[in-house]
Amino acid sequence: MNEAVKTLDGWFCLHDFRSIDWAAWRELNPGNQELMLNELSHFLSDMEITKNIGEGEHTIYSILGQKADLVFFTLRDSLEALNEVENRFNKLAIADYLLPTYSYISVVELSNYLASHMAGGEDPYQNKGVRARLYPALPPKKHICFYPMSKKRDGADNWYMLPMEERQQLIRDHGLIGRSYAGKVQQIIGGSIGFDDYEWGVTLFSDDALEFKRIVTEMRFDEASARYAEFGSFFIGNLLLSEQLSKLFTI
């Protein structure tokens, strides 16, 4: 049997995509709308406390197009904690007007090969660089791009039948492209084998949305993607600060 890749795992991730039911929201009187927005604000304040004590992260982006209107991206140290956030959010009054359109579950991962390289001889989980990758601080970048992907298992193009050494070389070459965008694009890779419909969820952040187009285009021509990758839907959006929510929901 071929050797399976080993990974280091960090925070669990939930991408929760919602569509605003504008027709139903418009029927509410302004007083009820304000009460619901205040309740949402208190919820987000509690999320900020969790973030400040280093036990999780979260961000909100406004999504373009008709796949969704919003994405709530939450990271926690366990599936139980992630589920608690999800359930609490769904119990908010405003959640009745935020219709689920898509979701994705993953866990931030780093290949054992890369983690060992970064950590040198020390325990990777104690290395600051490795920990920053596994338990990332989400950057307040203007734009987000999310997409799920898998590796092919199709005849001669079966990623999982390649020898470990060949896979490592392809990933190293692929990674060189990503590193060339350092300072322009920050990425978080979530492993989702056994968690969701694809094998990874990729989240990109940038202040220039065109960088998403550039990096994805360049990677498409790399063999690891051109020959072995399959992609799901792409979602792109703009940063939505908590204090901007009231303006968004004002009719």
From Swiss-Prot:
Cofactors, names only: Fe-coproporphyrin III
Segment forming the signal sequence: none
Bound cofactor: record note: Fe-coproporphyrin III acts both as a substrate and a redox cofactor.
Active site, renumbered: 147
Keywords assigned: Heme, Heme biosynthesis, Iron, Metal-binding, Oxidoreductase
Function field: Involved in coproporphyrin-dependent heme b biosynthesis. Catalyzes the decarboxylation of Fe-coproporphyrin III (coproheme) to heme b (protoheme IX), the last step of the pathway. The reaction occurs in a stepwise manner with a three-propionate intermediate.
HAMAP family: Coproheme_decarbox_1
Family: Belongs to the ChdC family. Type 1 subfamily.
Name the record gives this protein: Coproheme decarboxylase
